[in-house]
Every structure is written in C-alpha cells, then in structure tokens.
C-alpha cells in the first residue's frame, strides 16, 4: 500500500533519521496493537530523490492482507505527518518471506530457521554468516554453520530469514 504524503524537502543526517524512526515506532505501536498486529520494522530513507517511510507489519498467527495494510495506512498516516516535515511516500506491507530479525523475540520465534547475519565487527575475519538459528539464550544467537557459532545479539548489525527457493 503506497500513499503520497505532502511536505517540503530536507536532507537528514543518520542520527536524525534514527530519531524519526523511533518517534514513528512509538506513535504507531498502540494502533498496531489495537489491530492485533506486530511491528517488524520501520525504514525512513531517500531513494531516487524521494523520501519513503516503509512500515513492515505482521500478525503472529495469520497472513497480512492488502486490506490490513490499507487500514493501517489510514490509521497512522496523519500521525506520521506530524513527525515528518517533508513530502514522503508511506508504504505499509508485510515483511516478506525473508523478513528481518530485529528483536530478541524474533530470534526465539524463528529457532530452527535458516538465517543470514551481518555483524558490526569481524568475527573469525568475517562479518557475514549464513546458517541455521539453533537457539537464542542470554542475548546470544547460536548459529550452526560448519561449526556452531555464538554471536552476541549486540554485535548484530542486520539479520534476516533465508528462504530456500529449491523447496518450491
């Protein structure tokens, strides 16, 4: 679901973007909870000269529909307009089959799944790993690659599920 929001254009530093994302998360969370939805991720970025707010949502027990996305867009759009003082596109969608893993709860929920992990700092001369998430305990991600790795949650820059398209 894409919705064009109208405001003036400005350039933002990374820290300012993070503050905007935090404000968006805080302001939309009650509405999402009211609809029985979980917030997966919020992106605030510029692409091709246009600004975008992308909100990824899901139900824990069923799939998201286009109608769900439209309902959320209508419910939160005006609140987000109060935070962002520029023209932007508001996009609401499911996170997709290769959804990001952002919170400790995500790592618990998707134990047994194949994931990709990018680290903030090198571990064994590498920053990127792919393997099976065997468990999450005490803020440590246990990842089965050739060996079992233990990765502190705070060292993860980015992580997402990996869908094996060979299973289609």
Where does each model-flagged region fall?
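Short Lys/Arg-rich amphipathic alpha-helical segments
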Residues: 1-168
